[in-house]
């Protein structure tokens, strides 16, 4: 009698964040089904957990229209080859991790062949290009969503979706140790501390750094002991920021950090940041914040017409109200930013109330996401 085939899960991750999620999912599945087989497109973390890589993740990790166009033939070839090979393999479940432009079409191809498909990490369909929800519904048996309002959106369109919580909320403590973070960064325990996070993209750093620095100068007049920490994602962004600082605020003493955004947020009394995942991380670090964002006028005009949400930052979307101040476009200027940050640096009622709400929201999305994702995969595999 032929031996029963082990549980076979196919996965495709397209970037580092997806590799981290994939590795966590594989780990959780292996704990329950030790002989399971994992194949697909994997990064180093997924491979370290035992995923057989038919293609390296770097093949898919392209950003920007020009880069994508340059690699389009190769990407289309990989997708066609994966469709053929997965169809032959007939895995119990296919999991497309993020990379929606690549994965959702692949999921649709496989679903037509009778293979069960999951899309892990919802694209921001609730915010813009909402009609994508119909393609997602046709292509997948289940969407795994990090945030409760994402599930509410899919429910409206009868697309099966499971809220699993956010892996970042699992990884961060409910009560971070501010003094320990200050010790790591060399910040005195009794000083006022402000974190500036002008974004991870070159265009953001270019648009925001000067105003963020001028804001810090205004706040230093009010709080002479103010320590300013500026975590930057890589050497390129650091060089760009240093150049702007030399022109705008050469005499402002700041702590420039390579990475270490999380430590900077935990150590600080308040943060001024561009929107994006940084705002969620800042909320989980229990650091009161102001979101300041500016883009080119035409891009903003277009975004206002495309984006369907009342708020841009994740803490506000989670709270369903303006929990943190959002100052956009012409509102994003030093005087207004400083006025919004002053009550937070005072460390009084405003920041304590914000801290308490951040903690409640953290608990809402701290659901052991790796285990929840594994549950969803195994239920679909039955």
UniProtKB/Swiss-Prot annotation:
* Cystine bridges: none
Which UniProt keywords are listed? Glycosyltransferase, Lipid A biosynthesis, Lipid biosynthesis, Lipid metabolism, Transferase
Which Gene Ontology BP terms does the record give? Answer: lipid A biosynthetic process
Gene Ontology CC, one term: membrane
Q: Which domain of life is it from?
A: Bacteria
Q: In which pathway does it act?
A: Glycolipid biosynthesis; lipid IV(A) biosynthesis; lipid IV(A) from (3R)-3-hydroxytetradecanoyl-[acyl-carrier-protein] and UDP-N-acetyl-alpha-D-glucosamine: step 5/6
Where does the UniProt annotation place the signal sequence? none
Q: Which HAMAP family match?
A: LpxB
UniProt lists the family membership as follows: Belongs to the LpxB family.
What the entry lists under PANTHER family is as follows: LIPID-A-DISACCHARIDE SYNTHASE (PTHR30372), LIPID-A-DISACCHARIDE SYNTHASE, MITOCHONDRIAL-RELATED (PTHR30372:SF4)
Task: State the protein's name.
Answer: Lipid-A-disaccharide synthase
Taxonomy, top ranks, is: Bacteria, Pseudomonadati, Pseudomonadota, Gammaproteobacteria, Enterobacterales
